[in-house]
């Protein structure tokens, strides 16, 4: 299942990032004209659009751009996209934000990419696009979108293998993962064409386009492709030859798994979040409006970028359980206990742990996907934002709501919240929550992902009347918000019982603007809700942080090469602290010194004529060409290695640039604290939670009863 989906509906979300006031953030803005300033770019490719942003070295977002991307659905369950269109949209967004921000492209030191977990298919011979069907004549449609469900039969066959790698994806692969999609292609493509296919997860394809190098991310390979890092279940090379052979994909094992990106025999080939691949190659730098001075971070799935962009936020007041973790300044122990809820059409719940923790109905644990040596768990709700949309737009009073909200100049959700407040007085009830005390709503319209992992679950309502007024719509909306919150509690309770630590929920997405939903989430879970400054742009902001971390990673790796072989009394950690200090205080003298290795920050541009200008800043000249007419040129530099030597090899020493960057740049956040346990609303919600659980068991019981009877007729 997809990590996070773009929501472009009724919430009246603006294109610009939502930020706290300068007084709340207490972060100084860096001038784009500052010759010593450093800037970073983030790129986020969602289901319906590509986005990019520019941030400064204090984490201020200077510019944000978005461009829609198409998806094609010729028949049911077949949903495809174009990698060429996506790359062109990425280039447009990056060039736009650099121009609009006024930042000198020379000062952009790093770029990070996130995207949906969609399967990109290209030729292993020339990296041209290969059609993925159902129209096999249209090579432009070479991406099977994450939400494509064509591979149902193949998924069942894969799950029947019982392979040990399935243990790390909740016991079974989802039809939305990539191995089932690859198996479908084998069954439906001409044999010769399938033999020429090379496969990328979309985030890894974007970093390939940016660098010409085939480095893959642990995030994509581990979370969506059955890859096991070294030591997990005895894995020594990542991919399992036994697994691929058993499911009929032995072709993928040839040449050291080359068509999947290679194995861990090339230790430098798989990187974790924030680790540097290489500088931009010349072609990509021209297309993006950047320079070859800019380094590229390993890619990441979009929901995980939301985790990066939120969990290091500094709450405006103390949060119990988080104070202790503030002492961890050098590694990801400081992130433990911080649950990221990345919300949009659906919601993903991502949590880090030091040890592997298995939770029924929760994907993972995934090692090394966010930080080396740490494990990530991923729970999720398939219907949150889309659930609210569905209930509101299908109600008879929707037209009236739209008209009244427009007249009032507020979002539909804000208008409904005002109606609920009015109803408290009108009906003389204790609180807004009491308005739905006898309405029991269960909202899994499309099945349940977490924590019961039952695709057959469906929605049900107890207590509905024939009232079709706007007041009834408001109460139905309240019950849907309550359902989302109660299900979040259910997911959290299962994770806690399994051994996870959760002290706060770090929210992102447009749902953060819904004050009623935030209050219900806090009171149902009993946890503080932390809302960072970029609620609508947390994901693309997270990718920009990856770019910042990659820049620091590159500098440190370069310095480490210089120090190699020299005697030193310093420990690794001391050298790290001396070299890092803080992002704002890096020595420009050290940064500009090549020390026998050419830094991308110090490259001399060789151009055939005078440099182009954007806002009076120089850009490298490249031959005029469409942004992505062909992929052939990129393939010339394609390699399973980074270059002279691996930038990823041996870099991990118990420290983390990414966590330091997240702490320095994420900024402040506001908090919605839960009411006391003795508060009447908390007591009422506790009672309704028991009813919520009973509705789940009752629905499943009723299905079993009916299925038993139906089954007896066929005997």
Swiss-Prot record:
Region called Disordered, residue ranges: 1-27
Catalysis: reaction(s): D-ribulose + ATP = D-ribulose 5-phosphate + ADP + H(+)
Keyword terms, alphabetized: Kinase, Transferase
MF GO annotations: D-ribulokinase activity
Keyword hit for NADP: no
GO (cellular component) term, any one: cytoplasm
Enzyme class, first EC level, given as a word: transferase
Pathway(s) served: Carbohydrate metabolism; pentose and glucuronate interconversion
Coiled-coil region(s): none
InterPro entries the record matches: ATPase_NBD, FGGY_C, FGGY_N, FGGY_RbtK-like
GO biological process per UniProt: pentose metabolic process
This enzyme's EC code(s): 2.7.1.47
Domain of life: Eukaryota
CDD domains associated with the record: ASKHA_NBD_FGGY_D-RBK
Family: Belongs to the FGGY kinase family.
Function: Postulated to function in a metabolite repair mechanism by preventing toxic accumulation of free D-ribulose formed by non-specific phosphatase activities. Alternatively, may play a role in regulating D-ribulose 5-phosphate recycling in the pentose phosphate pathway.
Full protein name: D-ribulokinase YDR109C
Species assigned in the record: Saccharomyces cerevisiae (strain ATCC 204508 / S288c)
Phylogenetic placement of the source organism: Eukaryota, Fungi, Dikarya, Ascomycota, Saccharomycotina
